[in-house]
Amino acid sequence: MRTHRVKLFMATPKDTKKRAVVLLSGGLDSATVAAWLSNDGFEVYALTVDYGQRHVVELKAAAMVADALSVKEHLVLPIDLRPVGASALTDLSIEVPKGLRADEPVAANIPVTYVPARNTVFLSLALSFAEARKADVLGIGVNAL
C-alpha cells in the first residue's frame, strides 16, 4: 500500500531568498503567516486592502506588523467595497453585533459581518501583486467567513 504525504507548505533553505506575498489584514492569522514566511527566509511583500471597513484599526495593525517584520514592501490598496453593501463592516446602516461569545452557537445563516466575496476579491488582488513582484508564494490567513 502506498502512502502519500501532502506538504501544505514548503519552506526554502534560509540562504535562498525567495519572495512571498502575504495578504496582511492586521489580524492574528495573517500576521502569523507573514512571520512564518519571514522566519523561513522569504523576502516578504505585504498587501493590505482598505476596502472601506469600519475598523480602521485593522489598517494600523497591518502597518505595525509590516514594520515589525521589516517586510520588503507594504502596499495598502484602496478598493472601496461600500457600494456593494450587504455587510455591517461596510454599511453604516447595518449594526455590528456586539458581545458575542466564542462558545455561543453560530447561526445557520451568513452573519451580517460577511462582506460578499471579500476573500475572493482580496485573493485576486494578491495574485496580481504576487505576479508583479515575481513572488514564489502567496500567503493568506483566514479564520472565518
PLM segments and residue spans:
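ATP-dependent adenylation/nucleotidyltransferase module used to activate substrates
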Residues: 9-145
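N-terminal amphipathic/basic-hydrophobic helices that include classical n-h-c signal peptides
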Residues: 1-9
